[in-house]
A protein has these predicted regions:
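N-terminal helical capping/dimerization or prosegment-like subdomains
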Residues: 1-65, 69-73, 235-239, 253-259, ...
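Metal-dependent amide/peptide-bond hydrolase catalytic core
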Residues: 4, 22, 36, 163, ...
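Active-site beta-loop-alpha junctions enriched in small/polar residues
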Residues: 19, 67-69, 127-131, 157, ...
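Short amphipathic alpha-helical face segments that pack within enzyme cores
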Residues: 29, 101-112, 193-196, 335-342
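Active-site metal-coordination/substrate-binding segment of hydrolases
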Residues: 33, 59-123
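A structural signal for short hydrophobic beta-strand segments in well-ordered beta-sheet cores
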Residues: 41, 50, 84, 220-223
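Hydrophobic/aromatic beta-strand patches that form the interior of the parallel beta-sheet core
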Residues: 62-64, 125, 150-152, 311-313
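Acidic/histidine-rich catalytic neighborhood of metal-dependent amide-processing enzymes
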Residues: 100-170, 174
Length: 349
């Protein structure tokens, strides 16, 4: 494929709304286009993958992964988010930066690497439900892929390599009290009870600090209490956003939190674990040898689902993701293809 074909493939995806769990039309389009390129993908649900021949030949396997779903359009778009527009080097449209550019760049890298002699096999995949960490996305096809030795997860990182990624825990907390009339000295105010726990979330510092991800971060982001001005509230609900740093398991963090606060604490999910890769891993050493900068990512991705080594690297800028007038540069895509190929061509696992 040439750069013009990659651009047209990306623009075709942008033109098809594909919010999480509604990716069918985008998957249909991509499946058809891949067949037109002579690539016959396997499909499960709204997930597609292409597997190089030779399963079971003993070579290690590298998974190249990007996602086809998007968030819903942000407020403030000055143009139709589903009408891709080229303006010089820029392509505007929802999903250009997150994650269409990585998808097409990894596909082109896969195609270029196929005829080259390598010590590993490749699987390229375009998966659904990444933005919601859904069970119908990458997680649903991993059992079909066999043993994976390394994943390259394409996300907008400016082609820096994330060797660590924060996880995510969202807590629904409820502080209880006893209702009463606000004019009398009666009842137990649940808001005051909640404040003690909120202050703990605000001030507590976890001891273990990651070199790449820093400390565990906790933020109270939503709060709700009371029914009317003259009734002492008997419950106060609040939400806490927690970003684990790889040095605590999610279960360990939950044990610490529940042992420190008095409110009821219910995690929405414990699936979003943090991830990190040994900096002595061959792919990290290879990245260093060709001048790729390493960093720790504060945002989550499909890496949270993987129990084998992975890194995150892709064209674009994370700051453009989930924003109005999202865009990617064509030069960023072309440059990413070259870096992916250089990174993998010389890799020995």
């Amino acid at each position: 494929m040439n750069n013009a074909e990659l651009t047209e493939l990306l623009k075709g995806l942008v033109a098809i709304p594909s919010p999480s769990r509604q990716e069918k039309d985008a998957a249909d389009y991509l499946q058809q286009r891949l067949a037109g390129f002579g690539l016959e993908p396997v499909r499960k649900g709204n997930n597609l993958w292409i597997e190089e021949e030779g399963r079971g030949d003993g070579r290690p396997v590298i998974l190249l992964n990007a996602h086809i779903d998007t968030v819903k359009p942000a407020a403030g778009y000055s143009r139709d988010p589903f009408t891709p527009v080229e303006d010089g080097d820029i392509i505007y449209g929802l999903g250009t930066n997150d994650d269409g550019a990585s998808l097409v760049a990894l596909l082109e890298a896969y195609v270029r690497l196929l005829p080259l002699r390598r010590s590993f096999r490749m699987i390229w995949s375009a998966t659904a439900e990444e933005e919601v960490c859904g069970e119908g996305g990458l997680d649903s096809i991993l059992p079909e892929l066999g043993k994976i030795d390394l994943a390259i997860v394409g996300e907008p990182t400016g082609m820096k390599m994330a060797v660590a990624e924060k996880g995510l825990i969202v807590l629904d907390c409820t502080a209880c009290g006893k209702s009463g009339h606000a004019a009398r000295d009666e009842g137990e105010n649940a808001i005051y009870n909640a404040l003690r726990d909120i202050d703990w979330f605000r001030t507590h510092s976890f001891e273990r600090v990651s070199d790449y991800l820093g400390a565990v971060k906790m933020s109270v982001t939503m709060i709700s209490a009371g029914t009317q001005h003259n009734v002492v509230p008997d419950n106060c609900r609040f939400v806490v956003d927690i970003r684990p740093n790889g040095l605590y398991s999610n279960a360990e963090l939950m044990d610490i939190i529940r042992g420190s606060v008095s409110c009821e604490v219910v995690p929405r999910s414990l699936r979003h674990g943090s991830s990190h890769i040994d900096t002595d891993h061959p792919v990290v050493r290879r990245a260093g040898s060709i001048g790729i900068e390493l960093f720790g990512s504060p945002t989550t991705s499909n890496q949270t689902l993987l129990d084998f080594p992975s890194v995150k690297i892709g064209p674009g800028d994370s700051a453009r993701s989930h924003t109005a007038d999202e865009y990617i540069l064509k030069s960023e895509i072309a440059g990413a293809v070259e870096i992916y190929v250089e990174l993998l061509e010389g890799l020995e696992l």
